From Swiss-Prot:
The gene is chbG. Keywords: Carbohydrate metabolism, Chitin degradation, Cytoplasm, Hydrolase, Magnesium, Metal-binding, Polysaccharide degradation. One of its GO terms (molecular function) is chitin disaccharide deacetylase activity. Homodimer. GO terms for biological process: chitin catabolic process; diacetylchitobiose catabolic process; polysaccharide catabolic process. It catalyses: N,N'-diacetylchitobiose + H2O = N-acetyl-beta-D-glucosaminyl-(1->4)-D-glucosamine + acetate; diacetylchitobiose-6'-phosphate + H2O = N'-monoacetylchitobiose-6'-phosphate + acetate. Involved in the degradation of chitin. ChbG is essential for growth on the acetylated chitooligosaccharides chitobiose and chitotriose but is dispensable for growth on cellobiose and chitosan dimer, the deacetylated form of chitobiose. Deacetylation of chitobiose-6-P and chitotriose-6-P is necessary for both the activation of the chb promoter by the regulatory protein ChbR and the hydrolysis of phosphorylated beta-glucosides by the phospho-beta-glucosidase ChbF. The lineage of its organism: Bacteria, Pseudomonadati, Pseudomonadota, Gammaproteobacteria, Enterobacterales. Mg(2+) binds at residues 61, 125. Pfam families: YdjC. This is Chitooligosaccharide deacetylase.
Length: 252
């Protein structure tokens, strides 16, 4: 059985080093798709690079934890900035859901303005779209626009009122992340997906060259390791041997 493999590089637009790393992993590696933070410092640079790579699928990386929002969000921001306190607010069930829904629409329009087209799919920075309170908002938004959505199905099992026409891959993995990133790790993800009988799989990654912005990230130098693994000729061959076809969210 032929299986579709989407290797999606998150954080397009975060910095020039991140952008160049993603492009390198696409041109000379196994990355097939990316998602962009429209409030990133290098988002215009990302859009410029993407115009040279029309086959690279570019989706939107919905942001509620970093930088400035596109719209006014007094209920979620502190001193005008987004941050990781969103986890505490989610636990306390005090999320400003109307603000979040409006911000999603504004970021989506910002994406269209910057890239000149709709995104191939949606996901989010730090997976905040998988919060039980937020997921129905994002799922309905994606379904209404006919675009795909990253779904961690272990989490979605607890969500109610999901659109029946929501598109996603059958499998998703965030395991290619951390301090122990190897080619063997990547291939274990593929083998586990094949064992489950999944016809499509998304693997999340964050390849980058380190610059001053990336150096400020808690997840810094492993991005270089990811880039090295993802551009390995042996990895590309091993993926093909397993019957996977590289694709984007336009293929599901």
């Amino acid at each position: 059985m032929e299986r579709v493999l989407i290797v999606n590089a998150d954080d397009f637009g975060l910095s020039k080093g991140q952008n160049y790393g993603i492009v390198e992993a696409y041109r000379n590696g196994v990355v097939t798709s990316t998602t962009a933070l429209v409030n990133g410092e290098a988002i215009d640079h990302a859009a410029q690079l993407s115009r040279e790579l029309p086959a690279l699928g570019v989706g939107m990386h919905f942001v509620l934890t970093l930088g400035k929002p596109v719209s006014e969000m007094p209920g979620l921001t502190r001193d005008g900035l987004l941050g990781k306190w969103i986890w505490q607010m989610a636990e306390e069930d005090t999320l400003p859901l109307d603000e979040i829904a409006h911000e999603l629409a504004c970021q989506y329009q910002r994406f269209i303005d910057v890239f000149g087209s709709e995104p191939t799919h949606l996901d989010s920075h730090h997976h905040v779209h998988m919060f039980p309170q937020i997921f129905p908002i994002v799922a309905r938004f994606a379904a209404q626009r006919g675009i795909a959505l990253r779904i961690d199905r272990q989490t979605v099992l607890n969500a109610d009122d999901l659109p029946s026409d929501l598109r996603s891959t059958q499998g998703f993995s965030s395991e290619f992340y951390g301090e122990e990133i190897t080619e063997a790790c990547f291939l274990r993800i593929l083998d586990a997906s094949a064992h489950r009988g999944e016809a499509s799989l998304e693997v999340m990654c964050h390849p980058a060259f380190v610059d001053n912005i990336i150096r400020q990230s808690a997840y810094c130098y492993p991005r270089l390791t990811e880039l090295e693994v993802l551009t390995s000729a042996s990895l590309k061959a091993a993926i093909a041997e397993r019957g996977y076809r590289p694709g984007s969210f336009l293929d599901i």
